[in-house]
Amino acid sequence: MNSKLTALIFLGLVAIASCGWINEEKIQKKIDEKIGNNILGGMAKAVVHKLAKGEFQCVANIDTMGNCETHCQKTSGEKGFCHGTKCKCGKPLSY
């Protein structure tokens, strides 16, 4: 039960960080307080960093909020495609 609650809190913090309500640094400090600076804490901080740095909200090749498409239409007039957590204009996935 305790591990499920920890996972739920972690996912909530990741969602808050990706929305920009609180910054990544504050969340990483909370991870250090709760989990510690060990392998599990390092993995959690890496996930938070990877998800929080995506400015177009691309997650697992899915444009969750349409920001990638909007960005590409404004800048180049091409269709936007998510490649993992990155947005690429006019370059569809080849697999």
UniProtKB/Swiss-Prot annotation:
Pfam families, alphabetized: Scorpion_toxin_alpha-beta
Tissue expression remark: Expressed by the venom gland.
Post-translational modification: Contains 3 disulfide bonds.
InterPro entries documented for this protein: Long_scorpion_toxin_alpha/beta
Endpoints of the signal sequence: 1-19
Localization per Swiss-Prot or TrEMBL: Secreted
Disulfide bonds: C58-C82, C68-C87, C72-C89
A GO cellular-component term linked to this record: extracellular region
Record's keyword terms, sorted: Antibiotic, Antimicrobial, Disulfide bond, Secreted, Signal, Toxin
Domain named BetaSPN-type CS-alpha/beta: residues: 55-95
GO BP terms, alphabetized: defense response to bacterium
GO terms of molecular function: toxin activity
UniProt key word Phosphoprotein: no
Keyword Secreted: yes
Function: Has antibacterial activity against B.subtilis, K.pneumoniae and P.aeruginosa.
Protein family according to the UniProt entry: Belongs to the long chain scorpion toxin family. Class 3 subfamily.
Protein name: Heteroscorpine-1
Organism, scientific name: Heterometrus laoticus
